[in-house]
């Protein structure tokens, strides 16, 4: 199963992607992590991308798509993937479809986490991320045990510059002005599901999995049935 997860900054997309990979036994491919790894390893595509990033320019689609498809060609991703942060445009989605077709694969589901803009702003204003592994915390909803320190690896927590002020407004403008058109693209392919992202994390996950099983026709005997209990202590 290959899944595209669509959501604005602050929608909980990264959190749900991680949970879905565990529940469904898939791999998680986050575009931001892919770029960081390519820069660190100084791959040929990574170095080409870095020249644009260093100039403050957008990385051309041909490089971004090539990096994603190269990773998806790894045998470790053959059983399925949750794509997080890619594609961002219809052009990227079309290029992804063509590349997957050459591999004999396809996108099965595109899931949209629907969260009101005002809620996104409230979430982002209190979001903090650890420097080591990008674990996410929130004041006051999900604070760390020790102020400013990641519970998992003890690294420093920081607030991204694009999570505040005009920067976050601009990123949301881009999402609701451009990326949102992906919904129409996948709707026309009958692959789109919409999920209320303005719920507890466990509730969002349970709703996503229910939709996936309905869409794909899986039952509890399928290898895609969740690998852990989804019973929530919330509400």
Report the location of each language-model feature.
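Glycine-rich phosphate-binding loop of ATP-dependent small-molecule kinases
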Residues: 1-235
């Amino acid at each position: 199963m290959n899944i595209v997860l669509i959501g604005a900054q602050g929608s909980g997309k990264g959190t749900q992607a991680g949970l879905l990979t565990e529940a469904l036994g898939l791999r998680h491919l986050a575009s931001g992590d892919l770029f960081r790894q390519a820069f660190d390893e100084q791959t040929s595509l990574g170095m080409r991308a870095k020249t644009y990033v260093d100039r403050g320019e957008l990385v051309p689609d041909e490089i971004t798509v090539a990096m994603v498809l190269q990773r998806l060609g790894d045998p470790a991703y053959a059983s399925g993937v949750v794509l997080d942060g890619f594609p961002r445009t219809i052009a990227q989605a079309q290029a992804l479809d063509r590349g997957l077709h050459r591999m004999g694969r396809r996108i099965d589901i595109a899931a949209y986490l629907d969260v009101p803009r005002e809620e996104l702003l409230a979430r982002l204003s209190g979001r903090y991320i650890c420097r080591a592994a990008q674990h996410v915390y929130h004041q006051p909803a999900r604070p760390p045990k020790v102020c400013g320190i990641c519970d998992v690896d003890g690294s420093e927590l920081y607030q991204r510059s694009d999570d505040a002020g005009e920067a976050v407004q601009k990123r949301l403008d881009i999402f609701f002005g451009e990326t949102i058109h992906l919904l129409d693209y996948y709707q026309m392919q009958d692959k789109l599901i919409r999920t209320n992202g303005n719920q507890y994390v466990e509730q969002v996950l349970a709703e996503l999995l229910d939709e996936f099983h309905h869409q794909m026709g899986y039952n509890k005997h399928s290898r895609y049935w969740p690998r852990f209990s989804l019973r929530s202590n919330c509400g």
